[in-house]
Amino acid sequence: MFYAELFCQSNFSFLTGASHPEELIVQANFLGYHSLAITDECSLAGIVRAHSAIKQHQLSVKQIVGSFFKLNTECQFVLLCPNREAYAELCRIITNARRRCEKGQYQLSQWDVMSLKHCLLIWLPTGQTSDEQWATWLSRYQQSRLWLGLQRHLHHDDEHYLHHCQTLANQFDLPITACGGVLMHRPERLPLQHTLTAIRHGCTVEQLGTQLLTNAEQSLRSEKKLRKLFKPQWLAESLYIASLCSFDLDSLRYEYPSELIPDGYTPDSYLEHLVEQGKKLRFPEGVPDAIEQTIQKELALIKEQKYPFFFLTIHDIVMFAKQQGILYQGRGSAANSVVCYCLQITSVDPRQIAVLFERFISKERDEPPDIDVDFEHERREEVIQYIYQKYGRQRAALAATVISYRFKSAVRQVGKALGIEETQLDFFLKNINRRDRQAGWQVQLVELGLRPDSLKGQHFIQLVEEIIGFPRHLSQHVGGFVISSGPLYELVPVENAAMPERTIIQWDKDDLESLKLLKVDVLSLGMLTAIRKCFRSIEQHHQQRLSIADITRRQDDQAVYKMIQKADTIGVFQIESRAQMSMLPRLKPACYYDLVIQIAIVRPGPIQGDMVHPFLKRRDGEEPISYPSVHVQEVLERTLGVPIFQEQVIKLAMVAAGFSGGEADQLRRAMAAWKKNGHVFKFKTKLINGMLERGYELDFAERIFEQICGFGEYGFPESHSASFAVLAYCSAWLKHYYPAEFYTALLNSQPMGFYSPSQLVQDAKRHGIAVLPICVNFSNPEHQLVRLTSGELAIRLGFNLIKGLSHEGITRLLTHRPAQGYQCISEVKQILRQAKDIQSLASANAFYQLADNRYLARWQVMDNLDELPLFQTLPSISNNPLPKPSDYQNVLEDYAATGLSLAEHPVAMLEKAGGLTRFTRANQLNQCSHRSLVTVIGLVTGKQSPGTAAGVTFFTLEDDTGNINVVVWQATSRAQKQAYLTARLLMVKGILEREGDVIHVIAGRLVDLTEKLSGLSPKSREFH
């Protein structure tokens, strides 16, 4: 081991480094390096990935933690961490530098450098005349821990730079160490580094000029090359510095916040006290013996693993939400914990599902438990600010999410860097079918005109492939908080997020998990917002106060289940997707646990494991149910002998193959990543032999293993499904009994769910609910319920729907609105300051009470002549009426202004105008026979292409009577690519298929009718 690389930037030095940290650490090990320092610019974002790669691949190379800084254009250096104190110091330096600036920037001060007491400093001379001045300054403050880092990149002035550095070292008595200034793990990444540099500077590679690297010397180099470039003592000095650096990320220890413990309690005793209180609330009739045993088992393991603070922290957060009237629900593996149920973190009664605590906490796993809590998405910020206020910004921050290049951004950015016209890039992106599993995007690019024999074409494809997955920047996690007992910046650097009042750490959830650090997930859920708004509306209009618990106590309401069985579930949580709605009439849920199964079974795991059809056949009595043993029956009886949930796989491994709880959970984790690393196969022998030893047939053992592989990364936990089923039933109950309130709440909670406001309004109208247009005199910002003269409730659309109408405009409109309403448009013009606001109201036809039509309203908005004396004698506009817009023009204007229309559906309108050939409507399909030829026409309102569908795409078309489910096979989409990719109004000629109450059309011919809409563009929602 001849060398330690002490200056190496990964791709977490965004748009500079051209290799992943994992690639760098593996290549350094391959080249025989003693150590490698990942030193990204003012960042530690990549160090955990390198650390994990060493462990995963059992590498001998040592990782050194450090960071590269530019104090200014003349002074640059690397800081390395010899020990834990130096690491805390480095985190503090990075935090201070980042917090001084907006997101993505940093500003280091001279005081930051002067105050260093523990970090090792490698100064990197720039070759400028000011180097002597900076050497003097650095020597004054950091002499005992200061080196001169000599880089050799074989530029035209390399010999001059070499002499310059040696002179400085002699003059200031600085030891020299060899440094690579590494930006890539292999020389082949040079074109990518050029491309990244061009993206960073916003120009093409050809325009970079002197900013372009002239060679690939800033890659990890071989021993032979390094020995030619550097003196032996310079290489040896790198090893000496590496020997000083003993800090290891595994030495980081998380300390939980402690202020939640009242006097007289220990963390353990206070948790037990809260659980005792919770038992009385959750089990007023007394705790069943089996549940009590589970509670004691959980508490013992929580105490042993030293997790009480974690549970107390979550409990404190949800109690705050409860006090503030914010709806919340714990979900995920936490629903496997009776302790969480007693602490009111989760709402799933453990008597209703088979709880498996090993899925939540495992002694063998030795990791912090994962508790996800969803809060109303419109009020989650209150919870976040409570956490900041309680613990302070020094001790609480959000985890990061690494935003990486995906296909579209990669094509755009690489294409621009190579000088490809933006119109051509748009053409590529518009016509590439990413759902095509057989013809990759590379093949499709060639079909679209990219020349594979040209150098630019070859570079383009290669660079797009390489850059996909590269980090672009750090963003904030959806809600993962890290809270510590001491300053968080001593554990990990903290920086500003893009949102005001938010700070994030430089690690993501996977980094935290790798280091076994606690993360509190404060997530958001739109359905909780909708449910709360629905409850408030019910109380307002019916004087009935409801809660989720009130509804879930009525879990066997067959009227609700009949609605669900008919797949009348648009807007219903978790069972509103195309796939779920197709399964509902087949599975026919009739109780809460059926919903739990329903939510979990329409997942890639059960589908790939071939578990759906056996379950349905057994449920319908078409296939016998048998169990090889009583133990297996106890695990699988509730799902008719078919493993559907992750917990069942874990339990099967325990009862049938003799796995411990921790081993079984390791099996679950291997299942989650088996396609990536194949780790699940190391359990195959143990699983099958364990079953054979216990008397099970080889065929059964192998079938179970195949089902485990089928689950893959898509297996769904029962606890997760059980939590979701609570909200699914609650939202279905509200839709059935209070539809007007339900739709209004959904519309006021957008964006959420699968459906656009237009689709929700269409469904509300199909359910007989009157929907009233936006009106300048009656609307509010949000949609509201109003009572008609008939006594029925109707939905009045709100101002928030209008595109281009400002918040200030809405506020002024309402503040100054007279009790009797506005009498003329000129009144509104005097109140609204921005002409755009008045024009937006006119375009949305919000003046329909004051002007006969929107054209006339627009004219009056623009008409200022009567305000000028010269024109006061001209005839009034009323004597020269404008032509009224046609019904069709009104629909176009509605969609353009608000995204929906209350007028006649475009399909019906086009048919009346004679613009459509004969077709079958959605409400007529149930009269068509199985395998009959049909023609359907509708607006494309949804596309789904699940990963398990083998290239199949599921379209949702909407006509004036309802939704039509269309199945498009891959061969069809390839042959008719233009209509498949771009149609907004689509005609499908195909074969109707019927399975029970499930009807869909298998597409044969796709015809794009979008031109007939002449500007109408209801956007479809696409889900991949």
From Swiss-Prot:
InterPro entries: DNA_pol3_alpha_NTPase_dom, DNA_pol3_finger, DnaE2, DnaE2/DnaE/PolC, DNAPol_HHH, NA-bd_OB_tRNA, PHP_dom, Pol/His_phosphatase_N. Its main location: cytoplasm. One of its GO terms (biological process) is DNA repair. It comes from the Bacteria. It is an enzyme of class 2 (transferase). Pfam families: DNA_pol3_alpha, DNA_pol3_finger, HHH_6, PHP, tRNA_anti-codon. CDD domains: DnaE_OBF (cd04485), PHP_PolIIIA_DnaE2 (cd07434). DNA polymerase involved in damage-induced mutagenesis and translesion synthesis (TLS). It is not the major replicative DNA polymerase. This is Error-prone DNA polymerase. It is found in: Cytoplasm. Its EC number is 2.7.7.7. Keywords: Cytoplasm, DNA damage, DNA repair, DNA replication, DNA-directed DNA polymerase, Nucleotidyltransferase, Transferase. Signal peptide: none annotated. Belongs to the DNA polymerase type-C family. DnaE2 subfamily. It catalyses: DNA(n) + a 2'-deoxyribonucleoside 5'-triphosphate = DNA(n+1) + diphosphate.
